[in-house]
């Protein structure tokens, strides 16, 4: 299932990169920490494949949300 880790990261980076926003200088360390925590959680907990649908482990949702929150555009 290590290929799924790559696909999840690729999908997340594609979505985050498509909005044209990067964290400001003050939040870069926070963004790096959030991404590190998310990857560590995904490494420990395999994604769930059910009926060919890939879902994240429930205990990793908070880390994914933190990454998205760090990278969201201003004013959203």
Swiss-Prot record:
Transferred from male to female during mating and may affect egglaying and behavior after mating. Its main location: secreted. The gene is Mst57Dc. GO terms for cellular component: extracellular region; extracellular space. This is Accessory gland-specific peptide 57Dc. Keywords: Behavior, Phosphoprotein, Secreted, Signal. cAMP-dependent phosphorylation. Transmembrane segments: none annotated. It comes from the Eukaryota. It comes from Drosophila melanogaster. GO terms for biological process: egg-laying behavior; regulation of female receptivity; sexual reproduction. Residues 1-20 form the signal peptide. The keyword Signal applies. It is found in: Secreted. Lumen fluid of male accessory glands, becomes seminal fluid. The keyword Flavoprotein does not apply.
